[in-house]
Design a protein with these regions (language model features):
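Conserved GNAT acetyl-CoA-binding A-motif
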Residues: 88, 93-106
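Conserved beta-strand-loop-alpha-helix junction that forms the acyl-donor binding cleft
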Residues: 102-112, 129-133
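Conserved beta-strand in the GNAT
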Residues: 46, 52-61, 68-73
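Short alpha-helical
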Residues: 11, 64, 108-109
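Short amphipathic alpha-helix that is part of the acyltransferase structural core
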Residues: 1-29, 125-126
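A short helix-loop-beta-strand connector motif used in the catalytic cores of GNAT acetyltransferases and
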Residues: 35-46, 100
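Conserved acetyl-CoA-binding loop of GNAT-fold acetyltransferases
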Residues: 117-124
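Conserved acetyl-CoA pyrophosphate-binding loop and the N-cap/start of the following alpha-helix
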Residues: 78, 82-87
Length: 133
């Protein structure tokens, strides 16, 4: 298998929806909004196996100081093959001159995974949100 990585946003709404649903992420249930968000954020990197979208990472940033990796996902058929690591490294290179690169690890196994990629837990912080759905 030869995986191709790109920063081109040449995926369809359906491809994004299918990838997000493959990992049971609620964003996949809102394909129009998801696609709009991915088309309008600052950075998107994708991973492809032929014409199949198998991985995606996106980030939003303030232009110079802080970037937030919002999505990082790999299709279950391809997890464990280094795709998430490569997408993360692409983000780290893209934002190497920023002071902060943040992400949210939503479960304990992900904390260890991201620590292995150079991220550190921030003591005394809590993720907070206003959810409309």
């Amino acid at each position: 298998m030869e995986i191709r990585y790109t920063d081109k946003r040449d995926f369809t709404e359906k491809q994004a929806e299918d990838l997000f649903l493959s990992v049971d992420w609620a964003s996949g249930k809102h394909p129009e909004q998801l696609y709009k968000a991915l088309m309008n954020c600052e950075t998107v990197f994708t991973a492809w196996d032929g014409k199949r979208l198998i991985g995606l990472a996106n980030a939003i940033d303030d232009g110079g100081m802080t970037a937030y990796v919002h999505y990082l996902l790999v299709h279950p058929d391809y997890q464990g093959s280094g795709i998430g690591r490569e997408l993360t490294e692409m983000m780290k290179r893209r934002y190497k001159d920023f002071l902060y690169l943040f992400l949210v690890a939503e479960n304990p196994p992900l904390v260890g995974y991201y620590e292995g990629l150079g991220f550190t837990k921030q003591d005394g912080t809590s993720v907070m949100s206003i959810n409309k759905r």
